[in-house]
């Protein structure tokens, strides 16, 4: 649920950011950058900001927070989206009709999962089986490899 800020390549510009996640290690990652829903910014264990995206731009909104007044204040984020992941691994369209019971249960689940209140003994209803864990953006791995190779070349040249 807590995704690391440093595993996203923010250098590509807000419209090209990828927010990658998967349910299991053997799956190709899904890009959640065009998700809609709510998100939380965290500094360690403390939640410092709650926001929403009602158009498909979660990645762009998070990227904006890397440059605004909150930029130095968060190192992790959580998000809760409305667009389902289809069997093809891409985001589908959000449903348009939600019953009151589902909305209330979802609100409770988001509060329980996001705030982790110590007196709640269970997870929020309906959250199991729908959680995706973060996948590091492969471009960051490539950047690390290039930096390592450059350091090795520089140390040999001395």
Please give the residue ranges for each predicted region.
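Boundary/linker segments flanking structured domains
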Residues: 1-36, 40-48, 54-158
């Amino acid at each position: 649920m807590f995704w690391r800020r440093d595993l996203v390549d923010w250098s590509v510009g807000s419209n090209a950011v990828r927010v990658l996640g998967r349910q299991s290690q053997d799956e190709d990652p899904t890009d959640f950058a065009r998700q809609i829903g709510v998100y939380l910014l965290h500094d360690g264990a403390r939640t410092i900001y709650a926001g929403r995206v009602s158009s498909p731009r979660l990645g762009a909104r998070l990227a904006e927070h890397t440059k605004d007044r909150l930029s130095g204040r968060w190192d992790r984020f959580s998000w809760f989206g409305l667009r389902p992941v289809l069997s093809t691994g891409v985001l589908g369209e959000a449903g348009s009709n939600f019953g009151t019971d589902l909305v209330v249960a979802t609100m409770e689940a988001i509060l329980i999962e996001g705030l982790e209140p110590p007196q709640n003994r269970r997870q929020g209803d309906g959250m199991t089986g729908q959680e995706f864990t973060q996948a590091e953006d492969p471009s960051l791995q490539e950047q690390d490899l290039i930096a390592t190779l450059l350091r090795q070349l520089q140390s040999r040249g001395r």
